[in-house]
Every structure is written in C-alpha cells, then in structure tokens.
Amino acid sequence: MFFTPPQLQKLEQDWNGLAVRDWMIANVDVVLYISFLYLGFVFIGPKLFAKLVGTNPAAAAAGARSADGTGSPIVRRSMVVWNLALSIFSIFGTSTVTPVLLRNLANKGFYGATCDFKETEFYTTNVGFWMGIFALSKIPELVDTIFLVLQGKQELPFLHWYHHVTVLLFSWHTYCVGSSAYIWVAAMNYSVHSVMYLYFALAALGYKRVVRPLAPYITIIQILQMVVGCYVTIFALQELHGEGGRGCGVSPANMRIQLVMYASYLYLFSKMFVASYIRPPKRPTVGGPSSTAGVSNGSVEKKVK
C-alpha cells in the first residue's frame, strides 16, 4: 500500500480472518435476514417515503429533488461524503490487493495466480484483512439504495438491487468456503469502485456536467470486469473438472455461483449500456418529468442526470 495510517496498520495486524470466517459460518442466517430486509426495503421503501412526506409518489419524487435533480442539500451533502468514503476505501483496497494479484501473475503465471490457494493470504496478513473487509463491505454498500429512495425514486431498477443482494450473498459464501479465484473478484471490484464512487461524489458536488462524458467509459470498464470474471471462473472450473485439469483451490459450488453471477451481470450491464449510450431514449422536454434512473453500480450516466 502507498500509505497506511498507524491505526489501519494495527487493524491489519490484529485481523483474524479465520475467526471471522468461523463466525460467518456459524451465523450464516444473518446474511439471509439482511438480504430479506433489504429486498423488503427495495419494494416498500419508495412507497413508505411517499407516505412520510404526505403526498403521492410522483410529488414526493419531485419534492425530494433539488433544481439540478440530485436531491435535497442534506441528501446531496450526505451522498458526497458517502461516495467519497467508499472511493477512498476502495483505493486502499486496490493498493493492497491488486499488486499481490499482479505479482502472483508475474511469478506464478495465470494458473498459479488463479488456482493456488494460500490460507494465510486469504485470511491473515494485510492482504487477508482487505479480502475479508471486502466481503463484509457488501453490507454497508446497501446504503446506496437508501440514497436512491431519498432522492425520490419511485421504482428501484432491477440491476441495482439484484447486483447488491447477489454480490452480498456470494461474498459471504466465498469467505466461508475460501477461494483462490476470489482475489480476482476483490482486485477488479476495488479498482472499479475507486473510480466509480469518486465519479458519484463529484457529480453530487455539482460537477456532473464535467464528469458526465466519463460515464460510458466507466460502464465499459464494468463490462470488462464481468468478461474477465467469466473467463477466470470458466478457467478455474476447467482446471477443476476438465480432462487434464491440474486442480484448483476453489469450491465447485462457489464457482458455479460465481459464473452465474458474472454471466448475469455481463448481460444486464451490456443491455444497460446499449440502452443508455447506443440507443438512448429521447430526453424529456424542459420542465417535463425527470428521466433519472438512479442506478448505483449500474449506469453512472443515469445516476447523476
């Protein structure tokens, strides 16, 4: 890592990923409760918000937005702090996990970097800390959805909540079973989120017209992440089950889940990219209804319109 504050160094040194794993295994029902509560909020939250402000959903949406469509001043400032915090968090994770992946690729080749499972690297040391925190961070990232509701979203996009809940369940399962290929997931996701959440923070600060041209490129990077994820997963499964396979430090069930997850993301993100940037819908007339889709971890263009 380029710089590690002393307090963070102590957290890394004291991290006991094996104990965290054992707790997650013993309390696997917790992630199910969180997921069910989250899904309940997805479908009830917008309607509840409309009732709390004492009006219909359409009027609530209009009242929740400022003139530039990014939300009330309090919501907007909170979004800046939240997204900036997630970006900084992701930068720290990237600076720790990604160099290890690159070093493994250089020293061990693609097979070694993907299939050589080291328990110490996965559960202990500073790398293990950022792998574990990555898995657990999928819980607080659900707060993204709260901000969409506070901005007056009447219906949360499928890609938004599907992405959040599936990656949460997958990350919990992966940290419980251990996976040599998970370093790819963490390194890529940390890297993409470093840029994506910084984009959201700048947009909420009022610079959306400046950063908006970057939106399609960030989405392209997200799609490339899914392509690489599919390839890594298929490679691991081939080494595990294929004729002449050398074995791989992964769980077969976890890899099947990972493949379904990445393949579905690839389809959904690609479909969204085409709809947003290749065949975008006509913009509403001035003074007409807002076209904000508010897709966190989805179309960055739509989130900040």
Curated annotation (Swiss-Prot):
Glycans are attached at N297. Keywords: Endoplasmic reticulum, Fatty acid biosynthesis, Fatty acid metabolism, Glycoprotein, Lipid biosynthesis, Lipid metabolism, Membrane, Transferase, Transmembrane, Transmembrane helix. A motif (HxxHH motif) lies at residues 160-164. The chain crosses the membrane at residues 24-44, 80-100, 129-149, 158-178, 183-203, 217-237, 257-277. One of its GO terms (cellular component) is cytoplasm. It holds the Pfam family ELO. One of its GO terms (biological process) is sphingolipid biosynthetic process. Pathway: Lipid metabolism; fatty acid biosynthesis. It is found in: Endoplasmic reticulum membrane. The keyword Lipid metabolism applies. Its EC number is 2.3.1.-. It catalyses: an acyl-CoA + malonyl-CoA + H(+) = a 3-oxoacyl-CoA + CO2 + CoA. It is a multi-pass membrane protein. Disulfide bonds: none annotated. Its main location: endoplasmic reticulum. Disruption phenotype: Genetic disruption in bloodstream form parasites reduces fatty acid synthesis from C4- to C12-CoA primers, whereas synthesis from C14- and C16-CoA is less affected. RNAi-mediated knockdown in tsetse fly procyclic form parasites results in reduced fatty acid synthesis. Belongs to the ELO family. Involved in the synthesis of fatty acids. Elongates C4 fatty acids to C10. This is Fatty acid elongase 1. The gene is ELO1.
